[in-house]
Amino acid sequence: MNDLQLSAELALFLTKLPSEPGIYRMLDEEGTVLYVGKAANLKKRVNSYFSKQNTGVKTRALVSQIKSIEISVTRSETEALLLESNLIKALRPKYNVLLRDDKSYPYIHLSNHPDFPRIELYRSKKKPPSGNFFGPYPGVAAVRETIVTIQKIFKIRNCRDSYFKARSRPCLQYQIKRCTAPCVHYISPENYKLSVEDAIRFLQGKCQIILDELAERMKQAVSQLNFEEAAVLRDQIKNLRLIQEQQGVVQLRGDADVIAIEVRPGFACIQCVTIREGQVLNSQSFFPTVPYAVLDEELDANSLWQQTFEAFIGFYYLDTSERIPDLIITNQSITESRSLEYILSQRRGKSCKIQINPRGVKSRWMDFAVNNLRISVAEYVSKHSTIRSRYQALKQLLALDKNIERMECFDISHTQGEATVASCVVFDTEGPRPSEYRRFNIEGITPGDDYAAMEQAVTRRFKRLIDVQLLPDVLIIDGGKGQVSIVKRVLTSLGVEDITLLGVSKGPSRKAGWEKLILVNENREFVLPEDSKALHLLQHIRDEAHRFAITAHRKKRQKTRVESTLESIEGVGAKRRQALLQRFGGLRELAKAPLEEICKVQGISEQLAKRIYEHFHP
């Protein structure tokens, strides 16, 4: 044992540990989970933390805080890795490498419609719909660009099912040649299925297979004198070859994921390059948070690299076996590579190998990943040095003793009192935290009363934050002295004291750079120079709160107006309104619909259909 004085209970616990696979949770004196780990042999692994040979800075810092340890025995290492991954996502322990939630990374979803599947962007924590998923992609823009490419080449529909069912003529997507109008049966289910299969192969990187099949189908069309279909197939081949030329970084056979990692104090960068059929299909960067440690000690640097790699394996591959490739290539030796190969192969149902520092042609894949890794790290450091300098400037401006770790900002949006919505956005030292943004539908107030709206939103928000003990260091209100005073009163009534409250009003000209800051704690108002870093940070969070509020307000206003428009028609209640909207996809399409189409909606009589039609055609 090292020089740490273990309690008698903990020392006894270490001797009684089983020599079986499982996971362990290390807790501090308050019962907070500090670290979650997995082990093939719980007894050996947990005891190793308390060995004299374990001199890593991070390990010593962790061990000094451990008051108790909990274990869960599993049937296999695979089960242990899955459980570890799920617990890290749920508990987010201080000393684990933490990757961002899956919601941050969007997917492409192909629905399981029996005849005409839909392609769409999918990103949600909710239970995913059935169908095929591809991704994750580095961002929404990458998904949208890929979807547009698929629409141009394969003409897969992207409209909602309710809209699809309601069509009586082709929409604009057909006019611009991005859809074959399956809604009005301009294409048979059999031919549409061929397009969907080609789109799936395209997303899997199997371009050459598609090209061969398209060429064969084009020959058949020509031999049958079907020159129109042959021309369509010719254009598909041309577009695919163009993409193949743009996409191919290294033209080699095989499927692989190339993972390059760089660990720095406080963060790591993981560059994952997806290669299918010898072509680079995707390259994306992940930035997990890693525990701070002194990285000039070789042991700590290597240990954090290993943890980062294992955390990524759990995060990226274990939720879906379809993502596991034949080969994973990485740029540093892995202590448990054989164990990870076994786990991934079991999960996949066939072999998955891990290759370290490849030679020959595959080394070019690694070179590509490492080059992208360096660029990603440089961009991240540049961006976050700007963020840190802005946080430091705000700390100095507010004369705070401690660093600002978390800020929240509230804004109110409405149109002359209609559809009032409050927004709350969250920033931490990494910048915006969109997954923690919240909207509040404001009810029961006098329309247009911003003070009452702000009071309701802040009260609801802080009652919850007090329960979960997650209070911000700085609270920003997009408003003047009156709104800030209301918020101060709310915080006082809830017993919240240790928060810096700051108002940001637009000033007399309402121009950026002329904002007046209201510091309630010191009862003073002031204007910052336009080049102030603190002002830039406040403008950023204020603008984000405003954007989020106005987006929510517009959605609510549109929904309210649709409901009020339909319910003003005698005989149309909530159920019939829903049936109409599901059938036609929206108010605009309903307004254009002929009388005979409205009659087809379930629950709508001919007399009521006539009344609805006349409402839109007075």
UniProtKB/Swiss-Prot annotation:
Gene Ontology CC, one term: cytoplasm
TM region(s), chain numbering: none
Subunit structure: Interacts with UvrB in an incision complex.
Subcellular location: Cytoplasm
Cross-referenced PROSITE patterns: GIY_YIG (PS50164), UVR (PS50151), UVRC (PS50165)
UniProt-recorded Gene Ontology molecular function terms: DNA binding; excinuclease ABC activity
Protein source organism: Legionella pneumophila subsp. pneumophila (strain Philadelphia 1 / ATCC 33152 / DSM 7513)
PANTHER family referenced in this protein's UniProt entry, alphabetically: UVRABC SYSTEM PROTEIN C, UVRC/OXIDOREDUCTASE
Main location group: cytoplasm
Family, as annotated: Belongs to the UvrC family.
Free-text function comment from the UniProt entry: The UvrABC repair system catalyzes the recognition and processing of DNA lesions. UvrC both incises the 5' and 3' sides of the lesion. The N-terminal half is responsible for the 3' incision and the C-terminal half is responsible for the 5' incision.
GO terms of biological process kind: nucleotide-excision repair; SOS response
Sorted UniProt keywords: Cytoplasm, DNA damage, DNA excision, DNA repair, Excision nuclease, SOS response
Entries under NCBIfam families matching the protein: PRK00558.1-5 (NF001824), uvrC (TIGR00194)
Residue ranges constituting the UVR domain according to the UniProt record: 208-243
Protein name: UvrABC system protein C
